[in-house]
């Protein structure tokens, strides 16, 4: 009996030590961690800030993001500070429903443009049921999280107003909310510029070249960007030479899976190679992590 109790005691101590070390290693390390999750043909990004706060940008086309969050969030953490949806298309939006159901979310960021898809309706229902605070953001607004500054480059107030007007017209007619094709939603995709010391990252959603023309050359871009989340999964309409020459990204991450669209395109790859970008793809490498201390950075 004594040996049995001793075994339980030792086992309990070992378990306690494992939990303690897991807790210690999950504490904020003062670095920025950006995880581009492998969710197939879609986008889902988890950002853990130097002070321990966190943000999710898009949720991918399914629940795969939950597995990604489980790997990179502390095991005891069921709270996410900010969730942002770049635009309401399934390959960016659907997984956010599972995120909102599983985690307590403080703020939900979006543009004031939607659609009539069942997925978007379900997402709004969960946001309402969970009483998540919603913030509608447009170009020029900033979010400060510790030493990190996130600036919104797109959409502008005028673009959102245009989308709202189209929404009114088409919702009355029983058609799709935003014009005649869901591709129009890409025109309203949130574009975030993140700065942490000397480290810069650009998150582009599905914004294509005719959107990029509205912010290429902005005064926010005063030096080479370290990380580019490549627009629209590497679509041939996602970037042009002016965009790539403006950014000259050190690292370009393409979030992509098996698809029938030819993503990533040869044109996109060639543009990135022309400026010497390191190209990483989730379909070939799985989750991709970029870590920065505000001065240096590395790919994990």
Kindly label every feature range from the protein language model.
Residues 1-300:
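Non-globular, low-confidence helical/coil segments that flank catalytic cores
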